[in-house]
Design a protein with these regions (language model features):
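Glycine/proline-enriched, intrinsically flexible loops and inter-domain linkers
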Residues: 2-3, 7-245
C-alpha cells in the first residue's frame, strides 16, 4: 500500500472508513461488549443484533414501524428489510433454513411485479459536485461516459491499477452540477477518495448522504402513482428511462 499507492488485497475489514460520526465512544463500548458476549454464539444468516441501534433514523421510521417493518442498520442508519402483516410479527427467527421472512418478501415481490411498490433510498450515499471543472474532474476519476444535463448514467470508478472501487449512478443536474449515488456503507471511503483527488480550485464537493432523502418506486403501475402525486408530465414520452428532474 505504501509503495504502490493501493493495497494488493482487500483490506476493507480493517479500514476506519467503515465508521462514520455515528460511531461514538459510547457506541463502540456497547458494540464491543455485545461482540464479546457472543464470542461463542452461533451467528445466523440475516441475523441483526440489537445493541447500539437507532443512531440515525429517517422521517418514515415511526410510520414504517407501525406498518410492521423489520429493521437493520447500515452506517448507523436504520433501514427497513421487509414488512410483516402486524407490528407484533415484525421479527426474524435466526435459522440456516428458509426463514419466516420468505412469505413476506414474496408478497412484496409479487406486488412490485404486478402493481407498484416503494423502498426508501436514504441509505444510498449522495455525493455532490459543483463548479467549473466538475465535468472534467468526474471524467477523469470515472470510467464511464458522463450523462448530459437532465440524464442519469451508471458508471464504475476504478483505481489506477484498474480495480473496481465504486459502482456509481451519476445524475447530471446541470452542466457543471452532478450528484453521484453510491453505497451508503462506502460513503466515507468514497469521500476520502474524492477529496484526495479534487483540483485545488473550481470544483466543490460535499457528502449529502444525510441531507437528501427519497423513495424509489417500481412496478408496471409506477407512472400511474407518479401522476397522482405530481403535476409534472410523467408519461413515457416526456419522462424517459434515466431522466432526472
Amino acid at each position: 500500500w505504501m509503495i504502490e499507492g493501493e493495497p494488493s488485497i482487500d483490506v476493507w475489514a480493517m479500514d476506519v472508513a467503515r465508521f462514520g460520526d455515528f460511531a461514538t465512544p459510547g457506541w463502540g463500548t456497547i458494540k464491543s461488549s455485545e461482540n464479546y458476549e457472543r464470542r461463542f454464539v452461533m451467528t445466523f444468516p440475516n441475523e441483526t443484533l440489537p445493541k447500539g441501534r437507532r443512531q440515525k433514523t429517517t422521517a418514515l421510521f415511526d410510520r414504517f414501524t407501525s406498518k410492521g417493518a423489520v429493521w437493520d442498520q447500515g452506517f448507523g442508519l436504520e433501514n427497513a428489510l421487509w414488512f410483516a402483516e402486524r407490528p407484533e410479527d415484525a421479527h426474524e427467527d435466526p435459522t440456516f433454513h428458509r426463514s419466516r421472512a420468505h412469505k413476506y418478501v414474496a408478497r412484496e415481490v409479487k406486488a412490485v411485479r404486478e402493481n407498484v411498490g416503494g423502498i426508501e433510498i436514504a441509505n444510498y450515499a449522495k455525493h455532490e459536485f459543483k463548479g467549473p471543472g466538475s465535468r472534467e474532474f468526474l471524467n477523469y476519476i470515472l470510467a464511464g461516459r458522463l450523462p448530459r444535463p437532465g440524464r442519469i448514467n451508471l458508471t464504475p470508478m476504478l483505481t489506477s491499477k484498474g480495480k473496481l472501487y465504486g459502482d456509481l449512478t451519476v445524475a447530471c443536474m446541470e452542466d457543471e452540477y452532478f450528484i453521484l449515488f453510491g453505497s451508503g456503507l462506502m460513503q466515507e471511503a468514497h469521500r476520502r477518495w474524492f477529496e484526495k483527488r479534487l483540483p485545488e480550485k473550481g470544483v466543490s464537493y460535499a457528502n449529502r448522504s444525510d441531507d437528501y432523502h427519497g423513495v424509489a418506486i417500481s412496478g408496471p403501475k409506477s407512472r400511474e402513482l407518479l401522476k397522482r402525486i405530481t403535476r409534472d408530465d410523467v408519461t413515457s414520452g416526456s419522462f424517459r428511462f434515466r431522466d432526472i428532474r
